[in-house]
Amino acid sequence: MTLDATPIIKSLLDTDAYKLHMQQAVYHRYSHMPVVAEFRCRGDELLGEYATELRHQVNMMADLALTDAEFNYLSSLPFFKADYLDWLKTFRFNPQQVNISVTNGGQLAIHISGLWYEVIMWEVPLLALISELIHRHHSPDNTVENAVNQLRKLIKLFYQHAENEGIDLSSFKLMDFGTRRRFSHRVQHAVVSELQQHFPYLIGTSNYQLAQQLGLPPVGTQAHEWFQAHQQISPDLASSQREALQSWLKEYPNQLGIALTDCITMDAFLRDFDAQFAKNYQGLRHDSGDPVQWGEKAIAHYQKLGIDPMTKTLVFSDSLDFQKALALYRHFHNRINLIFGIGTQLTCNIPGVKPLNIVIKLVECNGKPVAKLSDSPGKTICEDNEFVNRLRAAFDIPQVKQAC
């Protein structure tokens, strides 16, 4: 096999913003913490045949480094401290941290281990690599124009439905969350550029490289791994979620204040999300479970705490498309501020193309298991049933179907 000498990932900033935001917090607070992350394909695709190409691309990532222009760009943002950015200039991917193999059944297996503040950077570019490699083989004739034309059709339908239903779009806000499962880097760039030029409700992108290139706000706070890791950082499992929330506020006391709610289910989250947290965080992000039920719970929680929901923001990001976002906007408009993060349905929405349902999740921290007990049973991640039972008991949650 002749391997392509052109790297797919060409910039350290070709990643989601929350990776850098979390990396800074880990660098400052947990710099000696070892972790393990693993790849999951939730679909039925056999991806093992691409292992050699993937390894080749991973090896080339060792050459990536923050450029002077990228350093200056990050320095201009309010999120980052000088000590972290100085260290980031020295950061290099270490391909030896990534073990790529093929199971007897032909599945792709990826095991990533090392210090958390280094391992944290692998997830997004690895998933983007896998997605682009597979689509190159499955859909070699698809073009960027196909993706942009499809987007234009979807936007037209969006406007038609909004007009037909008399929906005031003045408060609608969209963010691009499409890096991880994009068809290709070129498609993501073209789609976000199209939105920037022709969809006035776009308020940002999660991709730092695109944010820099297109002059868009970078968006993103923290991911499940932040809460998962604290299950083994906190001395008490029952207080681990509160410790994760508090530690984030110490790093970012006045910004990046959208909290992810579904690492251990929304109900367990709200029990920990007391008046002080609700006051200090700007809002909440939905990533699993029924979005309407979730939003109603969030609004009721704010009201119970005496907080006006119109001073807070809900971010919806679970498998959204334009029509789902419009339906949620119609339901919650004028009751709470809303933002919609659309990912795969923006950057891998091409007729005839099946997006991959792939993830990389934390499975260990400090040599011990961690778990994600999602509001969607199929999204639950576990490696150790005994630990899952301890987690359920600590947070008083019922039996959850596990996706191990």
From Swiss-Prot:
Transiently phosphorylated on a His residue during the reaction cycle. Phosphorylation strongly increases the affinity for substrates and increases the rate of nicotinate D-ribonucleotide production. Dephosphorylation regenerates the low-affinity form of the enzyme, leading to product release. One of its GO terms (biological process) is NAD biosynthetic process via the salvage pathway. SUPFAM superfamilies: Nicotinate/Quinolinate PRTase C-terminal domain-like (SSF51690), Nicotinate/Quinolinate PRTase N-terminal domain-like (SSF54675). It comes from Photorhabdus laumondii subsp. laumondii (strain DSM 15139 / CIP 105565 / TT01) (Photorhabdus luminescens subsp. laumondii). Pathway: Cofactor biosynthesis; NAD(+) biosynthesis; nicotinate D-ribonucleotide from nicotinate: step 1/1. GO terms for cellular component: cytosol. This is Nicotinate phosphoribosyltransferase. It comes from the Bacteria.
